[in-house]
UniProtKB/Swiss-Prot annotation:
SUPFAM superfamilies: FYVE/PHD zinc finger, RING/U-box. Its main location: cytoplasm. PROSITE patterns: ZF_RING_2. This is Alcohol-sensitive RING finger protein 1. A zinc finger (RING-type) spans 4-48, 121-168. It is found in: Cytoplasm; Nucleus. One of its GO terms (molecular function) is zinc ion binding. Keywords: Cytoplasm, Metal-binding, Nucleus, Repeat, Zinc, Zinc-finger. SMART domains: RING. It comes from the Eukaryota. GO terms for cellular component: cytoplasm; nucleus. GO terms for biological process: protein ubiquitination; response to ethanol; septin ring assembly. The gene is ASR1. Required for tolerance to alcohol.
Length: 288
């Protein structure tokens, strides 16, 4: 029994199979033509090798279809429909079973060996890093854009091609792996991760994220302090120095109060800023 790797249905469904002339992979005629139409190229969904012809049928009923010129799929099915291919010897069956098993392995998605992750397309398994273009920010699955488009076409919802097939997230970003694009690449997920489209050390990523979170929190807190300062008409000659001094002192107290986090649900920053600014201005003016 032969199974189409795209729709996973077998030849008992009445669908005619076609064989790509370069790589030899077989698919239902409708499935492979729909795949090619939506993926914007003529590459095999399994091995990514481009084929220009699709071979249908055997012997005197054989038909070679030029994929670049297009064809009427119904006419091709009618042409080879009279041929019966029920007789297969044991050797052929064994080879087909092995091929199906191989295809199943290739279509499982990203290979994970303990903590070592292979950088490859999560749909077709291709490991040529130079051709991988998108990755999921949530689960780090990697894809060819053409594979995502093709799969969306096959499931009947073309608007979902920008959705990760592993975790269903819409957080797909551009992948930039040029430095290792000439070789099979892998990484240890305990120490490394894909971040902002690049392979990065996990420690450096966490440090960067922590720094950005603190910086954003401080900026938001400072906005409350500045609004409170703007309520006071300070003398022009002393305005700049007083503004900077009070802003720094009050902001630091609010940073420490919320442990360098911005927690507007727990703290009334406007009220705290007004109180802090008033207190610091009294101290500043007294010292002056």
């Amino acid at each position: 029994m032969e199974e189409c790797p795209i729709c996973l249905a077998d030849d008992q469904e009445g669908e005619q199979f076609g064989c790509l002339n370069v790589c030899g992979h077989k698919f239902h005629l409708n499935c492979i033509r729909e795949w090619h139409k939506y993926s914007i190229n003529l590459k095999c969904p399994i091995c990514r090798v481009e084929s220009t012809h699709l071979e249908v049928g055997e012997g005197q009923h054989a038909l070679s279809i030029n994929l670049k010129m297009g064809f009427m799929i119904k006419n091709a099915i009618d042409y080879v429909g009279a041929e019966t291919t029920n007789e297969r010897n044991e050797d052929d069956t064994g080879e087909q079973d092995q091929e199906i098993e191989f295809l199943s392995e290739r279509l499982r998605g990203t290979l994970v060996m303990d903590t070592i992750k292979i950088i490859q397309c999560s749909i077709c398994g291709d490991t040529d890093v130079s051709r991988l273009s998108l990755y999921c920010q949530d689960c780090e699955a990697i894809y060819h854009e053409t594979c995502l488009r093709g799969l969306a076409c096959e499931v009947g919802d073309r608007n979902t091609w920008q959705e990760c097939t592993d975790c269903r997230s819409n957080a797909l970003l551009e992948l930039r792996m040029g430095a290792i694009s000439s070789q099979l690449a892998s990484y240890d997920s305990r120490n490394s991760m894909i971040f902002a489209g690049e392979l990065r050390d996990k420690h450096s990523v966490k440090t960067q994220q922590m720094y950005e979170q603190i910086r954003n929190a401080k900026h938001k807190i400072q906005m409350h302090v500045r609004r409170a300062l703007d309520r006071y008409p300070l003398p022009l000659l002393r305005f700049k120095d007083a503004y900077k001094h009070v802003n720094k002192q009050v902001s630091r107290k609010l940073y420490r109060l919320s442990d360098n986090k911005y927690l507007p649900d727990q703290y009334d920053y406007d009220s705290l800023a007004r109180t802090g600014v008033h207190t610091e201005l009294l101290i500043y003016c007294h010292d002056e």
